[in-house]
A protein has these predicted regions:
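A domain-level signal for caspase-like cysteine endopeptidase catalytic cores
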Residues: 1-65, 97-98
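Short, structured coil segments at secondary-structure junctions
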Residues: 33, 92, 113-115
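Short beta->alpha connector loops
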Residues: 43-46, 78-79, 100-104
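Conserved acidic residues
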Residues: 60, 94, 117
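Short His-Asn-centered micro-motif
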Residues: 64-66, 94-101, 121-123
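A short, glycine/acidic-enriched catalytic loop
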Residues: 68-92
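Caspase-like (clan CD) cysteine peptidase catalytic core
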Residues: 85-104, 109-110
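Active-site-proximal C-terminal subdomain of hydrolase catalytic domains
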Residues: 104-155
C-alpha cells in the first residue's frame, strides 16, 4: 500500500458543500508534506469511480465527506459509495476517516474486524452549525470553522 489520500468531495447540498470546501485545508496540508492526494470531486464521488481509484492507486488513507448511515457512506447526489456487506472490504487495512452520520456504528466496526487499519467516524449524527449569511461562501463562515477546522485536525 502506498502513502496517499483518496478524498471524496461531493457538493450537491449545503452540508456536502461545506464539508468539501473545508476539506481543501486537508489537501493543502497533505501537499505541504508531499503526500499524494486523489480528489473525487462532484460527480466523481461515486461508487464506480471510487472502486477503480482505490484499486489502481492503493493509497493507505481514505477520507469520506458526505451523508451516511450505520451501514452506508454516500457520495455525490447521495449515491452509495460504500455499503456494508458489499464493498466494505475496500476499507480493510487502511486509515479511514468518514465525516458521515452514524457510519462508525456498524460499517466502521465491520470494516476493521481482523484488519490492521482503523476507521475514524461517528456512531451518532455528525453535525455542525453554520451562519446562514455565509451559505454561498462556506470558507468565510466563522461558525462552521469552529466545527470543521477542528474536524480537519483528525485527518
Amino acid at each position: 500500500m502506498e502513502k496517499g489520500i483518496i478524498i471524496t468531495l461531493p457538493h450537491h447540498d449545503d452540508t456536502t458543500e461545506y464539508l468539501s470546501q473545508w476539506s481543501f485545508e486537508i489537501i493543502e496540508k497533505a501537499d505541504e508534506k508531499s503526500i499524494k492526494v486523489k480528489k473525487l470531486e462532484g460527480e466523481e464521488a461515486n461508487k464506480e469511480t471510487f472502486e477503480k481509484v482505490v484499486k489502481k492507486l492503493d493509497y493507505n488513507m481514505l477520507i469520506f465527506n458526505g451523508h451516511g448511515s450505520d451501514k452506508l457512506i454516500y457520495g455525490h447526489n447521495n449515491n452509495i459509495i460504500i455499503e456494508e456487506g458489499i464493498n466494505e472490504n475496500l476499507l480493510k487495512d487502511r486509515i479511514v476517516y468518514a465525516r458521515s452520520c452514524e457510519s462508525a456504528s456498524s460499517l466502521g466496526d465491520k470494516s476493521t474486524k481482523s484488519a490492521e487499519g482503523c476507521f475514524i467516524g461517528y456512531d451518532q449524527p455528525f453535525m455542525f452549525y453554520v451562519d446562514s449569511n455565509w451559505i454561498s461562501n462556506p470558507k468565510k463562515d466563522k461558525v462552521a470553522e469552529l466545527f470543521l477546522s477542528s474536524s480537519n485536525q483528525i485527518s
